[in-house]
């Protein structure tokens, strides 16, 4: 197993610990783990490109690790932490991702390759910043950060909806383009 795949597998295995630390009210450890796993996510992609070690297994492991990491982070910081993320973010992302999975399977069966969306990338960025902000708020109660978190959550919600519509429209265009 190469380095990028080992990093992805490690993220997959370690992600549930975020929930464990939050349930134990060990918010500093959960925040450190979230930051560590985010760094590992960056490094697995970096090594895959720089060492030319992109593999079929990695193309499955990396997005799976991303989804598991996101799920446990969102679950932990939406429902179980002292400071909580807006639950609409969790439910809208869940709905969007279920739609993407079903649509992706349908497109792949019809020999289409689903393309990433710039809106999806911005959604990931702002949801990640929202999670990080809530994670920090659980450790340090900073009033400015509370305001920033609210703004990040609003932007995240808008981007989730925009990316959902964008992915759906692109999927329909591919299907009806035949």
From Swiss-Prot:
GO terms for biological process: glycerophospholipid biosynthetic process; phosphatidylglycerol biosynthetic process. InterPro entries: CDP-alcohol_PTase-I, CDP-OH_P_trans, CDP-OH_PTrfase_TM_dom, CDP_ALCOHOL_P_TRANSF_CS, Phosphatidylglycerol_P_synth. The chain crosses the membrane at residues 28-48, 88-108, 125-145, 147-167. Gene3D superfamilies: 1.20.120.1760. It is found in: Cell membrane. It is an enzyme of class 2 (transferase). GO terms for cellular component: plasma membrane. Belongs to the CDP-alcohol phosphatidyltransferase class-I family. This is CDP-diacylglycerol--glycerol-3-phosphate 3-phosphatidyltransferase. The lineage of its organism: Bacteria, Pseudomonadati, Aquificota, Aquificia, Aquificales.
